[in-house]
Structure formats: structure tokens, C-alpha cells
Amino acid sequence: GAPEISEFFKFFVETARSAGARVIDRNNLTIIEEDGFAYLPEYLAEHEVEIIASLPCYSAENVNKQRGNGVFDKSIAALKKLNAVGYGTSLTLHLVYNPLGPTLPGPQQQLEADYKEALQENFGIVFNSLFTITNQPIARFAEDLRKQEKWDWYLDLLANSFNASTVEGLMCRDTISVGYGGEIYDCDFNQMLGMQITNGNQLFLWDISPADLKDRAIQTG
């Protein structure tokens, strides 16, 4: 998705920043190359919005295979524009990697080094950090796993690769996901599954305060 498409995007950014809040834009990069959105690099820089951007690989072949023809070139063009206004140096620019298909990502530190070397040498692009994400078996990915008859195999892979040291840092422990209608979820994965936070009734953003969420049980699927 592209949150920048929302007619309320600027309102959210400016209201949150004026209140002193830290704002992070989960950016797909290609939006910057679409008609009507060329203003984004300068706008985001002006409001000191941190960017976490999707780039599933540093090679054109793999990116285009996962996200469609032409996506890699658009992503590189967008990254250059972000670098030009200070992202990756004075402003925060992180990239996100997730593997293609039912495999686990490689070691994050090594992948980050590989990304930085390839993007700097080939395109003169810099960024701050790389985050690796494991593909969750939900929505379209779940459908693909079943079609490939790899559903059980992938669930076994996830179970056998469980890392207890990651539990403390799970985003659902300190973050909620909000739907376009004000629905609240423990995380974006639960949002995809329609698992709205409840207290017997479905809850919306205007029904709660931060204190209401403290020590509550996180829903799992």
C-alpha cells in the first residue's frame, strides 16, 4: 500500500509533528515516481519524517520478479531523490528486505552490508539500516503456499526456526495498527486477518486511551 495516497496524509503528518510526535512513513518508493507525488521527498524532509522503505533486493531481476516489471528502476530513482534532500545522512532512511517465496531471510547484519555495498557502488545510494522481515503465512502468500503444497512445510520451518529472543521486541507489544475506519488491531498482520481488538465489543481508536491497552492480552491467530 501507499499511505501517501490518502487525502488525510498531510493532515496526519503535520498534526503529529506539531504535537512533537515521531512520524515514520512506511514507503513503497514507487509512489514518489507516480504523477502528483513528486513533492514527497521535499515534503517529508521538511517535516523530518523518518522513512522505512521497501526494497526486496538490490538486483533488478529479483525486485521486478517480486513486485512487477519496472519497479526496481522506479525504486532506485526514488532513493536518489530521497538522498538528494538528506535522507540516508542527516535524515533517517531505513530499507526493508523480505525473501521471495517460502524461505527465511539471511542474517540481517550481512544483508545490510551487501545492500550498502551494492547500492553505493552501482547507484551512489546511501541509507541507514536494513531490516529483514519473515514472510507471514497469511492472505495471498498463504494461498500461494497451499497452491504449491508447501503450507505444512513452511509452518514447520517457522516453528523450527523460532527465536525466543525476538519476543521482547515484537511490534505488537508497543504498537497498534489502525484501519481506515478507526478500527484498532494489535499489529498489521492481525489487521489483514480481521482480528480487531475487542473488550466484548469491537473497539475503535476513539474508544481507548493508552492506559486501556496496558497489560492486555495480545490476540494471536
In which residue ranges do the predicted regions lie?
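Hydrophobic "anchor" residues
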Residues: 183-184
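Short, acidic, Ser/Thr-enriched surface-loop or helix-capping motifs
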Residues: 178-179
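Core AdoMet radical
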Residues: 1-5, 16-36, 43-79, 94-96
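Short, electropositive alpha-helical surface patch
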Residues: 12-22, 103-120, 153-155
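Short, basic/aromatic recognition patches
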Residues: 154-170
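C-terminal accessory region of radical SAM enzymes
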Residues: 126-158, 189-221
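Flexible glycine/acidic-rich beta-alpha junction loops that bind and position SAM and/or redox cofactors
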Residues: 35, 61-66, 92-108, 123-148
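Structural recognition of alpha->loop->beta junctions
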Residues: 38-54, 114-130
